[in-house]
Amino acid sequence: MNSKRMLLLVLFAFSLMLVERYFRNHQVEELRLSDWFHPRKRPDVITKTDWLAPIVWEGTFDRQVLEKHYRRRNITVGLAVFATGRFAEEYLRLFLHSANKHFMTGYRVIFYIMVDAFLQLPDIQPSPLRTFKAFEVDAERWWLEGSLVYMKSLGEHITSHIQDEVDFLFSMAVNQVFQNEFGVETLGPLVAQLHAWWYFRNTKNFPYERRPTSAASIPFGQGDFYYGSLMVGGTPRNILDFIEEYLNGVIHDIKNGLNSTYEKHLNKYFYLNKPTKLLSPEYSWDLAFSPPPQIQYVKVAHDSHRKL
């Protein structure tokens, strides 16, 4: 073997070694639940579901481990909100200012704001990590129920561009205010929000849709938790799957002369498609109630007495 050929073989072997080292150093390992979730630290509350999904409470998660993992993934998170109606402008101002301060701080965030033509967007201090995109909802759709208009519009935006822009997406109601950090402990493939009031009721008789002909129907004696409708999260693909099921359910009910609520359709979806992560009532506390001892920090608050 001549020296030139030997040199080429050595260089080839060296390049393979560099490539292997690069991918080893840049590979993001999957995060195990036990790496960041410590349910025994909160014996006063339910911290796992029957299908072993974590229920995130303050004190159950290791923020440093989560931060290290998601920073290596270099993620972008989307937050979609729908603002129309009498109090929409006031709510949107509080929502966006508080979200800009507490939602996924230190990460790239794209806010998707869906509004009617008459709404004045609030001034927000610009940041390199924050992008705000406003979309006017088609006026021809206003005869439809609000949740139906919003979800149909959100589904169209996910298909056309959101799925290519973010790794995770949250859809939240505008009549909420972030009060403490809403961070990467909330991320997952399919994330549900426990209903703040129903979580603390000692009953299995949740207000599910019970009419058997409704697409949202859950029979008596069945069901896991009662989920609130103010927030849903996950990957864009999973959010789109939910939206498609919700819209199909609404069409089914209309054909049968029924009109079930968005929240009941949401609960039916999570009954059939178990969420991979649940957020405690700390992440959507109703200001109409005094927090019980289990609520250590209210992350997000809403006022159920005021309607849009």
From Swiss-Prot:
Q: What EC identifiers does the entry list?
A: 2.4.1.-
Q: Does the keyword Membrane apply?
A: yes
Topological domain ranges for the Cytoplasmic compartment: 1-6
Gene3D superfamilies this protein is in? Spore Coat Polysaccharide Biosynthesis Protein SpsA, Chain A
Per the record, membrane topology reads:
Single-pass type II membrane protein
| Major localization class | membrane
The subcellular localization recorded is: Membrane
**GO CC list:** Golgi apparatus; membrane; vesicle
Organism's domain of life? Answer: Eukaryota
What glycosylation sites does the entry record? 74
Q: Which residues cross the membrane?
A: 7-23
- What's this protein's family per the entry? Belongs to the glycosyltransferase 6 family.
Q: What is this protein called?
A: Glycosyltransferase 6 domain-containing protein 1
**Which species does the entry assign this protein to?**
Macaca fascicularis (Crab-eating macaque)
The organism's taxonomic lineage, starting at the top: Eukaryota, Metazoa, Chordata, Craniata, Vertebrata
The gene from which this protein is expressed is GLT6D1
